[in-house]
């Protein structure tokens, strides 16, 4: 019998080639944790037959791979200088400088780098010739929107942070949807709702008058046509892929073109390296505690490091701590310092009891995946929002690095280790996170394929961006109702006054026509006596 298998294979290959797309990704110019996610996506896209290009500055370190290619440009940073810049920001924050000031300084560097990209004529012309099918924007660095507009290519947002911006257009009732950086939950009292409203208004003003205008000035400088505002570009995104999850995020209204894909880096634990396996095997029934503040935070202040070392040294558990810098003087004998560690594999080990973290999103999703309780000390950015949700969900405790004491840290660690409710909640959230159609990577690739297949998937976009502020909040209807009420009031007032005048006029006439209850036959007063008899008039001679 003739086999048709080769023909089916050939047909399938042809279909795959037909659907293959060229995708360009514009990652932020710093924060290597974001690149971990994008490299994972690039590998998955490669398996689907797509070709991915990273737009990176010269000198930025990235391992070569057959899964993606690189388009370099002369930017303001290379890997060494960007890391040094980020560590300087951390030192400034630890020394007491306002976090907001440091974040705005980062924004200034984002826009300076964006100016270099947009003004690089050779770079832009080369990218235009590539005829990309899709551009992925990380909204942490909003230059991606400008590049997409410049290239005239469809684009989608992939947010690597815990961020659900109001600019998406989804309803956000402030009574139960906490604003980013508010440190609130979906259960708010009166004062908290007032705070949430204030943070929302400040955020919208900051975005409208401080953030977006910086990029608009770049577009005006290089006369980008057709003229569009940054709001138009943000609203023009085909899809919003957000790194959050139903296990972590508070329930809230959303839109069809918004999908949750948090947990891109989650995976089962692999066997530990031999030296670490021996160390873990040496842990008694108390197990071990993992400590890591992420790849982006290489140096803690001496004060914080000493507090951590003191609290960790009092635990009966063994401690493995990802740490760089001078060794704390009060380091306990139970604590092992190491500059790099396989975090996911340690989190998945059966002997782990707790995780002490800064609340970075990638770390928290790995923690949720493996069902491990957390003590979080957020430092900046979305760390606070992430740990607020972890604490509200019952799988961890949030501590403030500026005020926490060694005793408070020790007590928090003991609590999450010895109170079984924290591990039970962590394991339940792990079940919820995993009980979804496919791994987050597969869901992300599906949606990228979807918007490519449907040429931007405009049918998913709500009309919210085509209506004005007055229409959205029904202010025009309120105006019509108020105007109608005012007209009705004046009409009723006029009718009432008219009727009143008529009644008053009739009453006045009747009053003048009657004296002591007797009618005067229509003759004016004075022609009759008061007793009702006729009064004779004297003739005038």
Curated annotation (Swiss-Prot):
The leader peptide range reads: 1-20
Molecular-function GO terms, alphabetical? N-acylsphingosine galactosyltransferase activity; UDP-galactose:glucosylceramide beta-1,4-galactosyltransferase activity
The top EC class, named as a word, is transferase
Q: Which InterPro entries match?
A: UDP-glycosyltransferase, UDP_glucos_trans, UDP_glycos_trans_CS
Q: Which domain of life is it from?
A: Eukaryota
Q: Which cysteines are joined by disulfide bonds?
A: none
PROSITE patterns assigned to the protein according to its UniProt record, in alphabetical order: UDPGT
Q: Which GO terms describe its biological process?
A: central nervous system development; cytoskeleton organization; galactosylceramide biosynthetic process; glycosphingolipid biosynthetic process; neuron projection morphogenesis; paranodal junction assembly; peripheral nervous system development; protein localization to paranode region of axon
* UniProt-listed SUPFAM superfamilies: UDP-Glycosyltransferase/glycogen phosphorylase
As for family, the record states:
Belongs to the UDP-glycosyltransferase family.
Which named protein is this?
Answer: 2-hydroxyacylsphingosine 1-beta-galactosyltransferase
The species this protein belongs to is Homo sapiens (Human)
């Amino acid at each position: 019998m003739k086999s048709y298998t080769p023909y089916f294979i050939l047909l399938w290959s042809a279909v795959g080639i037909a659907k293959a797309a060229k995708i360009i990704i514009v990652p932020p110019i710093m924060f290597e944790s974001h690149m971990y996610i994008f490299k994972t996506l690039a590998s998955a896209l490669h398996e689907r037959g797509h070709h991915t290009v990273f737009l990176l500055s010269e000198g930025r370190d990235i391992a070569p791979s057959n899964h993606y290619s690189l388009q370099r440009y002369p930017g303001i940073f290379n890997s060494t200088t960007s890391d040094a810049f980020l560590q300087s920001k951390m030192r400034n924050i630890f020394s007491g400088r306002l976090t907001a000031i440091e974040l705005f300084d980062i924004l200034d560097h984002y826009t300076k780098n964006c100016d270099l990209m947009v003004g690089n004529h050779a770079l832009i012309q080369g990218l235009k010739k590539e005829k990309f099918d899709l551009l992925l924007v990380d909204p942490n660095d909003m230059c991606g929107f400008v590049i997409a507009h410049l290239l005239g290519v469809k684009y989608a947002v992939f947010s690597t942070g815990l961020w659900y911006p109001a600019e998406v257009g989804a309803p956000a009732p402030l009574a139960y949807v906490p604003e980013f950086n508010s440190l609130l939950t979906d259960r708010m009292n009166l004062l908290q709702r007032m705070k949430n409203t204030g943070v929302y208004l400040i955020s919208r003003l900051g975005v409208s008058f401080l953030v977006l205008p910086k990029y608009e000035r770049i577009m005006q400088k290089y006369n980008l046509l057709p003229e569009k505002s940054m709001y138009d570009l943000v609203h023009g995104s085909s899809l919003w892929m957000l790194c959050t999850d139903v296990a972590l995020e508070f329930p809230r209204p959303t839109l069809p073109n918004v999908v949750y894909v948090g947990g891109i880096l989650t995976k089962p634990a692999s066997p530990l390296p031999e030296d670490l396996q021996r160390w873990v095997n040496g842990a008694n029934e108390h197990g071990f505690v993992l400590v890591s503040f992420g790849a982006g935070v290489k140096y803690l202040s001496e004060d914080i490091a000493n507090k951590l070392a003191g609290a960790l040294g009092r635990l009966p558990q063994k401690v493995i701590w990802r740490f760089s810098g001078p060794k704390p003087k009060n380091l306990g004998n139970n604590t092992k310092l190491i500059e790099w560690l396989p975090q996911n594999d340690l989190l998945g080990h059966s002997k782990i009891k707790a995780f002490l973290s800064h609340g970075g999103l990638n770390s928290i999703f790995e923690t949720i995946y493996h069902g491990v309780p957390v003590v979080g000390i957020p430092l900046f950015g979305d760390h606070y929002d992430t740990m607020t949700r972890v604490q509200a969900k019952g799988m961890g405790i949030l501590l403030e690095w500026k005020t926490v004491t060694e005793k408070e840290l020790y007590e928090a660690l003991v609590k999450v280790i010895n109170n079984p409710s924290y591990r039970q909640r962590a394991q339940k959230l792990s079940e919820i996170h995993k009980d979804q159609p496919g791994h987050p990577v597969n869901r992300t690739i599906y949606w990228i394929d979807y918007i490519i297949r449907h040429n931007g998937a405009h049918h998913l976009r709500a009309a919210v961006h085509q209506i004005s502020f007055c229409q959205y909040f029904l202010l025009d209807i309120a105006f019509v109702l108020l105007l109608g009420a005012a007209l009705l009031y004046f009409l009723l007032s006029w009718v009432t006054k008219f009727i009143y005048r008529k009644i008053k006029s009739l009453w006045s006439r009747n009053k003048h026509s009657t004296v002591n209850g007797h009618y005067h036959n229509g003759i004016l007063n004075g022609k009759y006596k008061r007793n009702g008899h006729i009064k004779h008039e004297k003739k005038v001679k």
